[in-house]
Each structure stands twice: as structure tokens, then as C-alpha cells.
Amino acid sequence: KDLYSEADFNKMKAEALFLRTFFYNELVVHYGDVPLMLTSAKMGDGYDKKIRTPRAEVVSQMLEDIDFAIKWLPNIAYTDGHAVQGSAVVLKCRILLNDQRYSDVAKLAGDYIHDPNNPFDLADDYAGIFFGKQENNPEIMFSIQFKAPDDFHALDQMVGSRMTIFPSFNLRASYEPNDPRIKMTMYEIGDPWPNNEKSGLFEEDGNKAEGLIPFTQLAFKKYVNPNVAVPKASTLSDQHIVKMRYADLLLMYAEAMFESGQGNDPLALKALNDVRQRPGVNMPVKPQLTREIIRNERRVELAYEGIRYYDIIRWDIAKDVIPTVQYDELSLIHISEPTRPISI
């Protein structure tokens, strides 16, 4: 500590607390009460037998930590994998939303969005957020970064060729007609498909390279690098995995304003319509906010980004949406059936 200035030391501490809060938020959403560990674990000190801490106490610690992070992280654009102030603001909004603290989210998100020093903005290329234009992208607020061939993942192989997860019919049906995000999110029959060695198209019998059939006749395009050959995809994938982006913050703000009784505020509607009206998407503006509109916009805008699961939990709609998930227009998926993971 003596080797650094107060600002430098607290910035490093803020990054560490941001990450601890990030992972505890994942645990709390999944498990509720979890063991809260605030000191380094050592062999023989019984850390493996630590009892679960009440959820409310864990959340209180998370909010204390993230407030420290917001104070000491720099308010600059996100570039190099290090959390910045905007990253911490998004994380705090997510924590507060999980507890239905809508007024607090509306205030926090609104203050940041409308701050003239806010360094973030919507990207002018929706598809580029996930492949091709990730470096210094103004919309990305936090991501897991990779650089092949030394630091890589296998997403192109597992999603782009083997299709270990694919879109449901319900997800496809949730898009409005002519929404260009459809083609930027998923492959449909007849689309160019690099893994079909015969026709080069995505066809009804699916992936010719691996011989696996997508039941929905859909496959995800987000994060897929069309230039990586299937045999090499396990070692060349280095797309950054986006965990937070500005569109999510805008939609959280719109939702929080609506749920806190401020849905008639023009700024709330503008936040949602800004997402819909980004260059390259240009979907018609919505004349007013409704719960259905907000929730569906989150579903399509953030599809296959790991957000929908948490939205289903905090909205308490699993009992409504899970039993109705469909492979296609006719076939319901029964929960007891062994199946490939499917994104709803």
C-alpha cells in the first residue's frame, strides 16, 4: 500500500471489489443465501465448512463494495479489460433491480446516462459488438477479453458449428417483423453458412460439417466468426464475451422508470427508443412504455447474452414461460426430455 498513491491503491482495490461483487451477484441470484467470505481462504481454517450467510447480508456487503468501486474507478471508456466506473454502475443497477428497488435504479442509471461526462454510447453496428468491431467499442462496458492463439475459447466450434445451444421458436417469434436484429442474432434457412461444405447455406438438415440437426432450424450468429474453419475453431476463437453494454443500462433505466411510476417521463421512453433506433436497426419508435414492450425489447436486444435467465427469475415468470418453450411452431419441449440447451 505504501508504494502507491491513495488514488492508485483505491483504484486497484475498487477493481477487486467489483469482481467480488460481480461473482457474488451470480451466486445470490442462483442460490440466495451463500457463504460470505471477506478474507483470503487458507488451508486448515475450516473455510470449506463455512455456513451460508443470509441473502440480505450478502447483498448489503455487495452494495457497500460496489459503492466503493463507483467512487474510485475512473469514469472513462472501457477498453482493456479493466472495470471502469460505468461497469460498476451497471452492476449496482442489476443488484438493485433484483430487489425491485426501482426508484433507486431510475436515479442511479438516469444520473449516469444523462451526465455530460458519460463516455458510453450505442454502437452504430449491432453485429460488430459481438464480432469484428469490439476494440474500443463505445457500447461495451465490461467484457471477458481473449487474444488467440495464446488466450482463446471454443465458442465458434460449440455454437457456430456443433450448435450445442440454439434459439427456440419462441425467441424467434418474439421479434417484430423486419427487425434487422434477427439476421444479426441468428441463422435461418437459406442464410450463408460457412459450415456447410456443399452448398454454403444453412439448410433444413442443419450442419453438414458435424451432422447435427438443429431442431428449431435456427442457429446463433452472435459471437460467431464466419472466417474460422470448423477444425480450427477450438483454438482460434478470441471474440470478447460481452458481459455489460450500454443498451442494457438504457433498458434497465426505462424499466425502472416505468415500474416506479415514472413511465410517462419522456426520458424513459427515449431510452427504449434510442435502443430501437440505433443506426442499422432503425425499428419504429414506440409511442409509450408498457411492461410488455419493455420486457420484450430486453428479450430481443439482449438475446444470447446471458441476461434472459436473470430477467425470468426477477420477473417471476418461469412458471409461465418454461412450460411453453417450443422447438418449432408445433412442438413443445418437455422439461423431463433430455435435449440440447436452448435459448428462450
Language-model region placement:
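Acidic/polar-rich alpha-helix caps and helix-coil junctions
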Residues: 1-156, 180-336, 340
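A low-complexity, Ser/Thr/Gly/Pro-enriched, surface-exposed linker/loop concept
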Residues: 156-162
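An acidic, gly/pro-interrupted, aromatic-rich
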Residues: 164-186
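N-terminal low-complexity segments that are often proline-rich with Ser/Thr-Pro
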Residues: 342-344
